[in-house]
Every structure is written in C-alpha cells, then in structure tokens.
C-alpha cells in the first residue's frame, strides 16, 4: 500500500495539513492516537471515519517524512 493513495494535502483543509482522502481526519490525529496507545478499534469507535488502512498509511507517511528530514539535514551539514 502506498500512503500517497489515501493521504493528501489541500491548503483549504486544515491549512494544508495532510488528511485522509474523503475525510477531514488528519494524519497528525491518527499518529497522536497511536502514540497514546489507542487501538484501531478504539479509534474507529470514537472516530468512525478512521479506517483500518489509515493506521499503516499514517505510519508510512511519518517514516518517509523522517527519512526526508534526515536526508535534508545531512545535505545541509555537508554544505556547511
């Protein structure tokens, strides 16, 4: 599964924060719930718009953002 298939950003929705397609559920919210120890069942019960594929997509999105940030930091360090 490619997170790009279900996560996107629109400047008119939450100021451009990444959200899941066909919803106003932010990736940030799902990651926060995951970090707080919520299960998928708890998330879905409390927020019916959260789907099973949202959890791995949010994790993949976060991992890629970290990799990109590390690459950028490394590039900056070499340039300095």
Where do the PLM segments sit?
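Basic, low-complexity segments
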Residues: 1-15
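Anion-recognition interface
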Residues: 22
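Long, charge-rich, low-complexity alpha-helical segments
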Residues: 25-80
């Amino acid at each position: 599964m490619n997170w790009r298939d279900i996560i996107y950003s629109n400047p008119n929705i939450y100021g451009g924060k990444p959200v899941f397609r066909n919803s106003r559920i932010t990736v940030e919210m799902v990651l926060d719930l995951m970090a707080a120890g919520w299960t998928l069942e708890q998330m879905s019960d409390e927020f019916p718009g959260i789907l099973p594929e949202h959890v791995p997509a949010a994790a993949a999105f976060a991992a890629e953002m970290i990799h990109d940030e590390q690459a950028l930091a490394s590039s900056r360090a070499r340039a300095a």
